[in-house]
UniProtKB/Swiss-Prot annotation:
Homotetramer. This is Arabinose 5-phosphate isomerase GutQ. It comes from Escherichia coli O6:H1 (strain CFT073 / ATCC 700928 / UPEC). Zn(2+) binds at residue 75. Substrate binds at residues 68-69, 75, 81, 107-116, 141-143, 215, 267. Its EC number is 5.3.1.13. Gene3D superfamilies: CBS-domain (3.10.580.10), Glucose-6-phosphate isomerase like protein, domain 1 (3.40.50.10490). ATP binds at residues 49-54.
Length: 321
């Protein structure tokens, strides 16, 4: 039984991959035309489809929307009962129907023409009513479904999904849509945390900043280390410019070497040291700490003045891993 199940699963995947392998050679003028129509659309892309095509259509609409192209899904039946009012003359409709002969099209196509709405087709029958009415046709046809009865949409839905991805990615690249643009539409996700957060969003402020003056003693710095528990202290002049850092490691080395606690900290500190810019991306700042094998750093503003402090744990708690 186990072998039979494995064989059935493998056969399905092989058939779907075989059908999908024909898609690249089908991309041509119609694909370019469809992409350009979407690129120049001043409104939204309205995706529609029935049955399994509708389910895939929802995903295509979501992919377009998250990659820089405003889009939403409308079910054809709902469109014919009022939701056509959502679609405006500035919009584009992408209709998905493998047969290209869905009866709802008989009523939808004239309404689109009345509003001068461009129609794009994703179909397995380019010469169907849908294909003939569309300004661009994306061919998703298959020789056979992966279903052993040749009934359940399987290979055809894979082709539909892949064609939708190809269209969305081509448009995305043409728009110059980048990682930060993507993060703005995913602010609650891990990518949003990685790309949208700046150092100043995560840093410790005010009394939580470990700092001493240049005139402070090693003892003062040691007490500040203990108070804040960050593993370092920023050593600043009277203008709050960071002149160095005094770390747990500096303290250990100082004491092992017989240094006195009354010595000015500027004689025991690491001169300069690593500082992070408050306006830098948090992910970039974390990489600096990792690369330099340190766990914390002072944060400075554009003038080099101390404005905060941060350690690796602050990044991890914000989901920047």
């Amino acid at each position: 039984m186990s072998e039979a199940l494995l064989n059935a699963g493998r056969q399905t995947l092989m058939l779907e991959l075989q059908e999908a392998s024909h898609l690249p050679e089908r991309l041509g003028d119609d694909f370019v035309r469809a992409a350009n129509i979407i690129l120049h659309c001043e409104g939204k892309v309205v995706v529609s489809g029935i049955g399994k095509s509708g389910h895939i259509g929802k995903k295509i609409a979501a992919t377009l929307a998250s990659t820089g192209t405003p889009a939403f899904f409308v079910h054809p039946a709902e469109a014919l009962h009022g939701d056509l009012g959502m679609i405006e003359s500035r919009d584009v409709m992408l209709f998905i129907s493998y047969s290209g002969g869905a009866k709802e099209l008989d009523l939808i196509i004239p309404r689109l023409e009345d509003k001068s709405i461009a129609l794009l087709a994703m179909t397995g029958k380019p010469t169907s009513p849908l294909g003939l009415a569309a300004k661009a046709v994306l061919d998703i046809s298959v020789e056979r479904e992966a279903c052993p009865m040749h009934l359940a949409p399987t290979s055809s839905t894979v082709n539909t999904l892949m064609m939708g991805d190809a269209l969305a990615m081509a448009v995305m690249q043409a728009r110059g849509f980048n990682e930060e643009d993507f993060a703005r539409s995913h602010p609650a996700g891990a990518l949003g945390a990685r790309l949208l957060n700046k150092v100043h969003h995560l840093m410790r402020r005010d009394d939580a900043i470990p700092q001493v003056a240049l005139t402070a003693s090693v003892m003062d710095a040691m007490l500040e280390l203990s108070r804040t528990g960050l593993g370092l202290v920023a050593v600043c002049d009277d203008q709050r410019l960071v002149k160095g850092v005094f770390t747990d490691g500096d303290l250990r080395r100082w004491l092992v070497g017989g240094g006195a606690l009354t010595t000015p900290v500027n004689e025991a500190m690491t001169v300069g040291g690593t500082t992070l810019q408050s306006q830098s991306r948090a992910i970039d700042a974390k990489e600096i700490l990792m690369k330099r094998k340190i766990t914390a750093a002072p944060v400075v503003d554009e003038n080099g003045k101390l404005t905060g402090a941060i350690n690796l744990q602050d990044f991890y708690q914000a989901g920047i891993i």
